[in-house]
């Protein structure tokens, strides 16, 4: 079994082959270096099969009894979560490496890039198989540095500025992560995952923040909030998400790896510590708020960008917010399912970026005519079909999933919120009918609805199956949903309010499509225009952080002069 751990170290052979070979034969060495990457992928598949059939694998690299008071044992722990992440990492890396052999061939940093890509893969594999928080943090730090090196593959000023910004912001979030680890060890005396979870559950600790005012916080809440600070940085959560758009000057394959693998580290960290987060409803609520805010802001800023890479970057921020929100709802397995699907999709999109840009530059852009606008109007049939579907789709999903798929969707608030997002997404899909020439055809409407139903049910079935695979104990899954439950009045208000907004949106679209005048006060139009500019400029957070940094440097220089 210990041989399976070597899967994480095999990519180091690729780095050695590529970076130590003769420069004149770099393409041949690059192709040879693909073999260890493929071997690592095959080994990851074998590991997944072994872990699924025989259970988790624990490998200690030394005998703890032979060392006096070992604070941090060195070893690896591979369970189903680790094995799934290993397959995702090695699979995506295999495709990116093969693509990079030709794409990056004429780049001056060709060998350096391929070597760092292989080294990053090995570090990612070691991170997801770490046996304790200390080892996980060590590889987490190495990953941050390698991300800086990969983002700075091109030696020119914009790339350096983006890479430095990335390195700085990740250092701040990693400081919070380190604080959480130190606090966890001081409170519970261990950094091993299973003993840590057990001690946190059996021995609740309360910390006094301000004794004179009676301010207190649960120890597990303090630990999980600090560790979540590290996850916020890696997964580009608001307000420390600005490093991701600034790193867009890196090579396209680097973005494929970043958006498909590295940025998922936050979701993996929350899943690895799910039993710990399940003990703190306050932390889960905070995670939910941060994730929801990031998802909304990321999607909104994506719609205002005019650059394809920035659009994809903010799309990733929105998707990472959605993934973190799922963790905040207690749907940890769904977050893993989401990061896998998003990782595969975004890797494909980024690797196809160059081809899309090339075609866009060659194809003429025709102005939109009045005739086109008339054809895209919503017909009465299309609107009524979409509106009724918007109202009836949740009921149909509930009936079918309960009666046929036996998936309980009413037992927790988290699943209801996720159902609401499915509802909104389905409504958006129905709007695609407006882009069809046969927009008034009942056959087209029926085909769209049937396809939509099949997609929704397939998705729910796949998620339920994956949940049972990743967390076989139903009680554990239920405990996470109970811990993440919101106050009843707040939950009901959110559901009713968002439902009314969605329904009003349909009426607004119908009225505009039929030429009805909707009177909007002048101050509202001005506010919307200002809001558009605000989102287009990414909330001016880059400028705000830059001024804040200059202010801190100025204060530091003044203090230095006074003390010297």
Annotated model-derived regions:
Residues 1-521, 529-564:
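...captures the hydrophobic TM-helix bundle architecture rather than a specific catalytic motif
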């Amino acid at each position: 079994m210990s041989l399976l751990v070597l899967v994480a170290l095999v990519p180091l052979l690729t780095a050695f082959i590529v970076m130590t070979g003769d420069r004149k034969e770099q393409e041949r060495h690059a192709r040879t270096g693909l073999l260890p990457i493929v071997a690592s992928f095959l080994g990851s598949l074998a590991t997944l099969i072994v872990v699924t059939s025989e259970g988790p694998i624990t490998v200690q690299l030394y005998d703890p009894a032979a060392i006096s008071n070992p604070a941090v044992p060195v070893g690896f722990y591979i369970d189903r979560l680790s094995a799934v992440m290993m397959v995702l990492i090695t699979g995506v890396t295999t495709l990116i490496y093969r693509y990079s052999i030709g794409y990056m061939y004429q780049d001056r940093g060709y060998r350096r890039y391929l070597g760092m890509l292989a080294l990053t893969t090995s570090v990612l594999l070691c991170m997801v198989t770490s046996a304790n928080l200390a080892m996980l943090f060590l590889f987490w730090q190495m990953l941050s540095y390698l991300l800086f090196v990969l983002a700075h593959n091109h030696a020119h000023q914009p790339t350096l500025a983006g890479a430095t910004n990335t390195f700085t912001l990740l250092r701040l979030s990693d400081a919070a992560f380190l604080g959480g680890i130190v606090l966890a060890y001081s409170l519970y005396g261990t950094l091993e995952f299973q003993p840590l979870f057990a001690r946190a559950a059996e021995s609740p600790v309360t910390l006094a923040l301000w004794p004179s005012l009676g301010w207190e916080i649960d120890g597990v809440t303090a630990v999980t909030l600090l560790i979540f600070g590290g996850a916020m940085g890696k997964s580009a959560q608001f307000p420390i998400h600005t490093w991701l758009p600034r790193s867009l000057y890196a090579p396209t394959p680097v973005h494929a790896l970043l958006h498909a693998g590295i940025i998922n580290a936050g979701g993996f960290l929350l899943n690895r510590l799910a039993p710990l987060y399940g003990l703190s409803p306050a932390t889960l609520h905070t995670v939910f708020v941060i994730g929801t805010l990031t998802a909304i802001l990321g999607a909104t800023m994506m719609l205002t960008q005019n650059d394809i890479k920035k659009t994809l970057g903010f799309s990733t921020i929105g998707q990472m917010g959605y993934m973190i929100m799922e963790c905040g709802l207690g749907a940890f397995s769904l977050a893993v399912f989401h990061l896998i699907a998003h990782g595969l999709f975004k890797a494909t999109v980024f690797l196809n970026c160059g081809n899309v840009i090339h075609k866009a530059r060659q194809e003429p852009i025709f102005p939109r005519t009045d005739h086109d606008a008339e054809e895209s109007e919503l017909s009465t049939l299309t609107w009524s079909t979409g509106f009724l579907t918007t109202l009836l789709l949740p009921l149909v999903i509930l009936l079918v999933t309960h009666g046929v798929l036996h998936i309980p969707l009413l037992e927790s608030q988290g699943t209801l919120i996720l159902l609401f997002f499915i509802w909104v997404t389905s409504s958006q899909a129905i709007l695609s009918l407006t882009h069809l020439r046969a927009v008034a055809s009942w056959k087209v409407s029926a085909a769209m609805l049937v396809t939509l139903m099949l997609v929704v049910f397939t998705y729910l079935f796949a998620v339920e199956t994956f949940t049972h695979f990743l967390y076989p104990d139903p009680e554990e899954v239920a405990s996470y949903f109970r811990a993440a439950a919101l106050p009843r009045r707040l939950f009901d208000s959110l559901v009713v309010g968002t439902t009314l907004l969605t329904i009003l949106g349909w009426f607004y679209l119908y009225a505009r499509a039929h030429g009805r005048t909707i009177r909007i006060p002048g101050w509202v139009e001005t506010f919307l225009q200002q809001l558009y500019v605000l989102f287009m400029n990414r909330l001016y957070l880059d400028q705000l952080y830059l001024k804040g940094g200059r202010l801190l440097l100025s204060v530091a220089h003044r203090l230095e002069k006074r003390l010297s």
